Amino acid sequence: MKLSVCLLLVTLALCCYQANAEFCPALVSELLDFFFISEPLFKLSLAKFDAPPEAVAAKLGVKRCTDQMSLQKRSLIAEVLVKILKKCSV
């Protein structure tokens, strides 16, 4: 539960910041990839951001945690995040 609240708050901060209410399509892709693709594929998708190895390792650590959630719970979280993104883009 704590992890989903953190993800929700981060998404709100990124999407609904006053200076830029437009969200980046890469954010949507990255969020959905985070919940639904395998760890090796996700690691490849993170390569496009050229993040430091420590950041990639941290993100993969969180992904390992969320991968332990049932697919149904991950789908519910993704659904809420998509709804938030839609509201932020209006």
From Swiss-Prot:
Subcellular location: Secreted
Gene Ontology terms: cellular component: extracellular space
Pfam families in the cross-refs: Uteroglobin
Tissue specificity comment: Highest expression was found in skeletal muscle. Expressed as well in thymus, trachea, kidney, steroid responsive tissues (prostate, testis, uterus, breast and ovary) and salivary gland.
Key words of the record: Secreted, Signal
Main location: secreted
Keyword Cell wall biogenesis/degradation listed: no
InterPro entries for the chain: Secretoglobin, Secretoglobin_sf
Record-linked PROSITE patterns: SCGB (PS51311)
Signal sequence range: 1-21
Assigned protein family: Belongs to the secretoglobin family. Lipophilin subfamily.
Function: May bind androgens and other steroids, may also bind estramustine, a chemotherapeutic agent used for prostate cancer. May be under transcriptional regulation of steroid hormones.
Name listed for the protein in its UniProt record: Secretoglobin family 1D member 2
